[in-house]
From Swiss-Prot:
Subunit structure and binding partners: NDH is composed of at least 16 different subunits, 5 of which are encoded in the nucleus.
InterPro entries: 4Fe4S_Fe-S-bd, 4Fe4S_Fe_S_CS, NADH_quinone_OxRdtase_chainI, NDHI
Species assigned in the record: Palafoxia arida
EC numbers, comma separated: 7.1.1.-
Domain 4Fe-4S ferredoxin-type: residue ranges: 55-84, 95-124
Designated name of the protein: NAD(P)H-quinone oxidoreductase subunit I, chloroplastic
UniProt entry tagged with the keyword Translocase: yes
């Protein structure tokens, strides 16, 4: 008879433990129920990206000295730098610079290590196209500054700030 009593006690303890776990999950569910939805209506509403957002790379052709540091620090050797050595002035002259954003992982190493700061990250993140070859940007396409979301009057901007609980 004694083993039968311990089985009932274990069953009772397991029942109480299961009810407690279910109650904890229910409390978490109820705490999430009173939050505001996070969804936005994308084409008409856009989040303002943070200052350190890593979007499309902006390139300034005049500042580049063709040192190829960006190629060496890139984990996938992505930037294509074509240059010609000018023998009369003993300097490299940049001929072509291109980045394929279909392959780029937006790590920011090229921007970080560029000695002349000719590369910078913009807040542009809409790079989708129907043809993947359109994602190969040359120095002309990289030199264009993106249109700011804030300046577009057709788009309602939403600040992406964390809520402060009081």
């Amino acid at each position: 008879m004694f083993p039968m009593v311990t089985k009932f006690m274990n069953y009772g303890q397991q029942t109480v433990r299961a009810a407690r776990y279910i109650g904890q999950g229910f409390i978490i569910t109820l705490s999430h129920a009173n939050r505001l939805p996070v969804t936005i209506q994308y084409p008409y509403e856009k989040l303002i990206t943070s200052e350190r957002f890593r979007g499309r790379i902006h390139f300034e052709f005049d500042k580049c000295i063709a040192c190829e540091v960006c190629v060496r620090v890139c984990p996938i050797d992505l930037p294509v730098v074509d240059w010609k050595l000018e023998t009369d002035i003993r300097k490299k002259r940049l001929l072509n610079y291109s980045i394929d954003f279909g392959i780029c992982i937006f790590c920011g190493n090229c921007v970080e290590y560029c000695p002349t700061n000719c590369l910078s990250m913009t807040e542009e993140y809409e790079l989708s196209t129907y043809d993947r070859h359109e994602l190969n940007y040359n120095q002309i396409a990289l030199g264009r500054l993106p249109m700011s979301i804030i300046d577009d009057y057709t788009i309602r901007t939403i600040l992406n700030l964390p809520e402060i609980k009081t």
